[in-house]
A protein has these predicted regions:
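Short acidic, S/G/P-rich loop/turn micro-motifs used as interaction or catalytic elements
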Residues: 120-121, 139, 169-173
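Iron-sulfur (Fe-S) cluster-binding segments and ferredoxin-like electron-carrier domains
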Residues: 134-147, 348-358
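Auxiliary Fe-S-binding modules of radical SAM enzymes
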Residues: 1-78, 252, 256, 277-358
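Residue-level recognition of the N-termini of beta-strands and the immediately preceding loop/turn
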Residues: 161-163, 260-263, 335-336
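Short, conserved acidic/polar surface loops in the N-terminal third of protein domains
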Residues: 88-90, 123-127, 175-177
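Conserved AdoMet/S-adenosylmethionine-binding subsite of the radical SAM
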Residues: 148, 153-156, 166-309, 316
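N-terminal pre-triad scaffold of radical SAM enzymes
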Residues: 20-21, 25-52, 94-136, 152-162
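Non-catalytic propeptide/linker segments at domain boundaries
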Residues: 67, 76-110
Length: 358
């Protein structure tokens, strides 16, 4: 598969999801039972050609997908009825007997993602982000002492991993920043592993400095929607954090973490592509790595099921973004976490193509 096909099929899978045959489901259950016990069958992290891809498989919108995960002679493959290509899985983390068995998962080789908080202060009537599918399972985040001890056990059994933390914003952005600072300090007592954290910009920007001092390596603050008026409609609660404050936080984070060690997600399919491309350059020129993820109408998200991202638009945006990444010296391989994984977007693949064509 050449790079153009890789980009095409990844854009298709990200925007349309895929179905799974009964045979494939059965074999997945026997080979990767953790996919089911952790609810990972809602999406699968797969690798094909030279890319990672997080594919929706159980959400309602994926039931109409032209793509099917199947298996033959023990080999998993994806087909649209005309072309087929093999895929592999990243497998499961070792069993620790701790809370990470329920919360941690491999998103790509060596990238462990953990959501300590399922409680978001914006998950309220008339405040929840329209694209968000978070479901509150606990009133508070996992206790930092309990989680850090669990991660220590995991690292004793599985070395050379980095950590990517995400999840709901508990109480408010400042309180959540304090939680991350406390947790990372505890992890740093036993591990030098790279740590990336997704968080909403705190009102006190000194907390970003304290996160770096605690041992965080990468800061991820997702703006999601470029146009401020549209952002207020799509993110009615989170948009109380002003657009200007996001950029104040971006500038502070780049100052503290360094060029290319800060990133932000923009969501394609819910806003004009021209707005996204313009915002990408505004971010890139100050050292923030833009990531463009397509909207996926996930179950439990308020977004209408018919809200989709055109895969051709996603490719156009990512091709433009790849040129910006080269122009502003932003290399995904130098930023740990979501950016390096690249499973939910295609700009890394387009960046590789841009370098090949240079």
């Amino acid at each position: 598969m050449d790079i153009n096909e890789q980009i095409f099929y990844k854009a298709e899978l990200l925007t349309k999801g895929m179905r799974a045959s009964d045979v494939a489901k059965s074999l997945l259950f026997s080979e990767f039972p953790d996919f089911f016990t952790k609810g990972i069958m809602h999406s699968l992290n797969v690798r094909f050609s030279e890319t990672n891809c997080n594919v929706s498989i159980a959400d309602d919108f994926a039931h109409e997908s032209p793509y099917l995960l199947d298996v033959k002679d023990g080999q998993f493959f994806i087909t649209d009825g005309q072309k087929s290509f093999p895929v592999s899985f990243f497998g499961a983390l070792p069993h620790t007997g701790t809370v990470v068995d329920d919360f941690a998962r491999l998103h790509s080789t060596g990238c462990v993602t953990i959501w300590p908080s399922s409680n978001c202060c914006y998950d309220k009537p008339n405040e929840k982000c329209k694209f968000c599918s978070i479901v509150k399972e606990s009133e508070t985040p996992l206790d930092a002492d309990v989680l850090s001890e669990a991660i220590k056990k995991l690292f004793e059994l599985s070395k050379d991993n980095m950590l990517n933390f995400s999840g709901g914003t508990y109480k408010n952005p400042d309180a959540m920043a304090d939680y991350w600072i406390d947790l990372v300090k505890k992890i740093r007592a036993f591990s030098p592993a790279k740590i990336a954290i997704e968080f909403a910009p705190p009102s006190d920007l000194q907390k970003i400095v304290k996160m770096k001092e605690a041992g965080v390596d990468v800061a991820i603050m997702n703006l999601e929607v470029a146009n401020d008026d549209l952002r207020k409609k799509i993110c009615p609660g989170k948009s109380k954090i002003s657009y200007d404050h996001y950029y104040n936080a971006f500038n502070k984070a780049v100052e503290v973490f360094g060029w290319g060690q800060v990133s932000s997600v923009l969501i394609a399919g819910i806003q004009p592509k021209e707005d996204i491309m313009s915002e990408c350059e505004k971010m890139a020129k100050i050292g923030v790595f833009p990531t463009v993820m397509p909207i996926r109408p996930l179950d439990n998200a308020p977004v209408d099921l018919n809200t989709r991202c055109d895969p051709d638009d996603l490719i156009e945006i990512a091709t433009h973004l790849a040129k910006l990444l080269v122009k502003y010296n932003l290399d995904f391989k130098k930023q740990e976490g979501c950016t390096k994984c690249g499973g939910c977007s295609i700009e890394n693949d387009c960046y590789r193509k841009e370098l090949q064509n240079a």
